[in-house]
């Protein structure tokens, strides 16, 4: 019986393991399917990581290296090249590796840190032929940054998520011509700083409310047809533009990788596509926790690490205490303008001082206010100058406020009309 097994050795798994060790656990095992720790950070060679966590700008591999160095100062065990096949409700982990073959591990506590994966062309149903030269932005990033291959010379990017924006800059720096970035929504899905640094600084046009309606080519992509879309995201006839390209990169969203979570019977949130979690990142199964992009997709790895610190500390407390909480829980409900909240459930009796609520808005907002209500009563209000779907918002709800609630809490957004 292992005290704590962590599934995934990316930024979430590394932070959770170190936090659990710092909080008194000594029997910790990380299972990582890749041949090295660090996860997606290893291919993110651009800077911008670590400002919140370490107080300086780091590249992805540097950030991962800092986390791995911290882990080396502990006695946490790591098994690389180990694929987890199943997690059961009674906390048994079925995994396989070349060195040890098929194993069934029993754990007192589990933290799920599997991260997320990219949506593919098949997931969004782009019409046209199926030639070579169509990649997800993350796959292209790995080819360019880790394998040393330039995937194309004339590039069109569909989607304005952060990976797509960063790859627009990377492909330009590597000598390719990025003709445009095309986004089906009327707003960008990425951080404002990435739009400025990756598109505007390199004079790459961004077409909002546009999408690809046709791809032409035999052995290789030759042309892509882009059209404007209406408010229902349907192409508008007569607005087509043709681009002569040999490569199309897709940055059309990320999906939390939750096959193991569903297999374990853990309740899921249809909005985040991740597990429903309590204020301490515990899932619906006592002793099983989840953190990072497997719960909801983050903008910054620093926030992943912070969330994982909490999960690691909570798992340590669960194992050392030896019992699950039986405190009453309140539901957090996304109201007007809010896409989701994490956590989805809060136990006021178990909150120390306050609980941090993360959420995303459904559209761009100017001056606005975030309200927290219970049964029509307003319990809290927070002001913001601007909010966008591509940037996660955070509010802190104090314990004293939570104790006033006698039912579900609704988090909503209202735009402030200037008088």
Give residue ranges: language-model regions.
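A Rossmann-like FAD-binding core segment of flavoenzymes
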Residues: 68-95, 172-259, 353-385
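FAD-binding core/adjacent interface of flavoenzyme oxidoreductases
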Residues: 1-7, 65-154, 231-238, 249, ...
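Short amphipathic alpha-helical segments
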Residues: 17-19, 42-43, 123-126, 168-170, ...
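Beta1-alpha1 glycine-rich phosphate/pyrophosphate-binding loop at the start
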Residues: 2-66, 70, 142, 151-197
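Rossmann-like nucleotide/phosphate-binding core characteristic of flavoprotein oxidoreductases
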Residues: 1-3, 80, 316-419
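Predominantly flavin-linked oxidoreductase catalytic cores and closely associated redox partners
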Residues: 102-103, 109-206, 211-220, 287, ...
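FAD-site-proximal beta/loop scaffold in flavoenzymes
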Residues: 112, 134-144, 247-298
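A conserved FAD-binding loop/helix module that cradles the flavin
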Residues: 291-335
């Amino acid at each position: 019986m292992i005290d704590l097994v962590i599934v995934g050795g990316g930024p979430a798994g590394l932070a959770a393991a170190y936090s659990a060790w710092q909080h008194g656990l000594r029997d910790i095992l990380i299972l990582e399917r890749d041949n090295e720790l660090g996860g997606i950070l290893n291919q993110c060679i651009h800077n911008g990581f670590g400002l919140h966590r370490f107080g300086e700008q780091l590249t992805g591999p540097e950030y991962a290296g800092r986390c791995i160095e911290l882990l080396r100062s502990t006695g946490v065990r790591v098994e690389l090249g180990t694929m987890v096949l199943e997690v059961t409700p009674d906390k048994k982990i079925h995994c396989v590796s070349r060195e040890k073959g098929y194993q069934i591990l029993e754990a007192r506590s589990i933290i799920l840190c599997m991260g997320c994966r990219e949506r593919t062309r098949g997931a969004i149903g782009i019409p046209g032929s199926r030639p070579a030269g169509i990649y997800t932005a993350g796959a292209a990033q790995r080819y360019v940054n880790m394998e040393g291959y330039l995937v194309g010379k004339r590039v069109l990017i569909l989607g304005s998520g952060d990976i797509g924006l960063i790859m627009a800059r990377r492909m330009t720096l590597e000598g390719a011509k990025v003709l445009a970035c095309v986004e089906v929504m009327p707003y960008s899905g990425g951080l404002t700083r990435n739009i400025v640094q990756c598109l505007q600084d390199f004079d790459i046009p961004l077409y909002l409310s546009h999408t690809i309606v046709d791809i032409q080519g035999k052995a290789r992509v030759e042309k892509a047809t882009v059209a404007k879309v209406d408010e229902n995201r349907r192409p508008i006839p007569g607005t087509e533009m043709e681009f002569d390209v040999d490569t199309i990169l897709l940055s059309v969203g990320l999906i939390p990788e939750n096959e193991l979570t569903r297999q374990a019977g853990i309740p899921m949130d249809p909005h985040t596509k991740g597990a429903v979690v309590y204020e301490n990142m515990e899932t619906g199964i006592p002793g099983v926790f989840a953190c990072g992009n497997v719960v909801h997709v983050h903008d910054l790895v620093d926030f992943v690490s912070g969330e994982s610190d909490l999960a690691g500390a909570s798992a340590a407390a669960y194992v050392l205490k030896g019992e699950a909480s039986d405190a009453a829980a309140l539901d957090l409900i996304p109201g007007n303008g809010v896409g989701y909240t994490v956590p989805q459930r809060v136990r006021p009796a178990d909150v120390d001082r306050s609980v941090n609520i993360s959420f995303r808005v459904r559209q761009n907002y100017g001056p606005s206010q975030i309200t927290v209500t219970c049964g029509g009563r307003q319990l809290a209000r927070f002001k913001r100058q601007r909010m966008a779907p591509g940037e996660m918002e955070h509010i802190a709800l104090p314990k004293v406020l939570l104790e006033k609630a006698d039912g579900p809490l609704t988090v909503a957004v209202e735009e402030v009309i200037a008088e």
